[in-house]
Amino acid sequence: MAIEGPLVPRNVTTVLSLDDVRLAGRTVLYRVDVNSPLDPSNGAFLDDSRLRSILGTLRDLSDSKVVIMGHQSRPGKIDFTDMAGHCDRLSRLIGQQIRFVGDICGDQAMTAIEEMHPGDKVFLDNVRMHPEEYGEKKVKAEDESSSEVVTRLSSVADAYVTDAFGAAHRNSPTLTGFTEEIPCI
């Protein structure tokens, strides 16, 4: 998908970085890999380096409306959990309140995104809780752009940014499905 219009300068024809685009005031879907080791006895973080690794990008997007998407483990595993703890830790690390939304692309998530103002950040729930992302109803690679997750979230977003390189080898809607729908950086 060619990126045109006010997001980027007209002469940009190469791979884009955040330095190349103007995202201030825009709604950005931000896919991260914050899958972290958790203490099995209490769910506490044993290492939060993956959360720390996204602080720079979050600061770069400080004038945007940032919708954070991530996962923690897989269904059935002892460390599979919602993203509330990740949201809390990330809020403390960045020194800004990030709103946890216990939803991925349903009405609660859509309302939270629509109510955002520039500078706000929301952290959606574990994307692997959505059946199209992981599990029996996981969509095929060729159908990811028409999945519910991509269709709904791309309708309220201006761009997609990924720092989920640790999971980039996987086919799932939140990793590869947005490429045909909205500008991806």
Walk through the language-model features, giving the residues of each.
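Active-site loop-to-helix "anion-binding N-cap" substructures in soluble metabolic enzymes
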Residues: 2-185
